[in-house]
Amino acid sequence: DLMLQPQDLGYPAPLGKNLWHIGSDEMLKYAEMILQKQHPLLQHVQQPMFVYVLTMKEHGPYHTDTPNHFNLVKDGLSQKTIACLNDYTQRIVALNQATETFHHSLKQRNTPYVFAYFGDHQVAFDNCLPPKLGQYANPDYVTQVVVRSNVPSSFTQQQTFVDLAFVGGLLLEIAGLPVEDEFMRANIAMRILSEGKLEDAEDQSLVNDYRHYL
């Protein structure tokens, strides 16, 4: 395993610099550099690489003076909240553009890839928490998971809901890679048994047994 900071790949800042404002397009540019092994510690790597990238630009706080670019109107929302929502939305638009550009670069490499991305947690605008939909155990942490790949696979999605704790096994299956340890075998089996749920599973005794087994 190897942990690289953006500064290790050319970002002009000291290692102790706060990176909350680094753009997601920049972060994905550094991910491309890692895949191209543009770092001395990567040049000997021959096996497939698993690269995890954390983007930060989408995180709050959000600016309360952002113009209403998206013409948002809703009863009960203050002007500050609408401004924050516009700021958040424009950051998500930029993230989407960066994501599509990165995915295009993956396709151009003509090598097998599995590209997955997911959100972190629900947002608060001007200290206003939007109402949550659905009966979830932790509604503030409901997000989306997207997987895109050029690897031929017989994998079919069985669950309409999946806990992020099961994404590792999901990616192994989609990539067609062998599951070589008991932890990941249990991870995949539990995802199937619990229909992708963990905290939200109806059978919490099964969840407790799974955790005890791990």
Regions found by a protein language model. Give the residues of each.
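Solvent-exposed soluble domains appended to multi-pass membrane proteins
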Residues: D1-L214
